[in-house]
Amino acid sequence: DLENDEQVWPVFLELTQDIGHKLRVHKKCADGVAIHIRDNTLFSKQWQTALDMPTQSPMLIAKAAFALFEKRYDWRNPIRSVTIQAINLVPQDTPRQVDLFMNIEKIEKAEKLDQCIETIRQRFGKDSIRNGILFQNLRMPCEKSEITMPTGMLC
């Protein structure tokens, strides 16, 4: 069970690595994120939020999901399971509207970095490059299960 925010953040980051990869493979961007939290009494809660702009970045998705988690989860009980979903998917070539306060150069630089990381992972394997925090003892199963929904979609 996860007992504090410091244990939850690496799990969010690990889960969003796969989300970012799948978004790139399917040429989609997420315009929102949803989290599903189940505590050790098996009580579940789900929340969702919109992102500032559509993205494929695992880090931006993880940060948005974690901000939502910190805002909504009250820590009555330890967490048994966490699910993160990219929602409101749009094609990756959809024009994005920026505002006056966005640092578009920083965003583009981060997107290029994410693309480079994705290229390295495709060439040398998905664990060839990782965030340093993910090398600590993650409180999640080593093997993630792949669930096939009745519609044929993979989760």
Model-derived features: where do they sit?
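Basic, low-complexity intrinsically disordered segments
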Residues: D1-C155
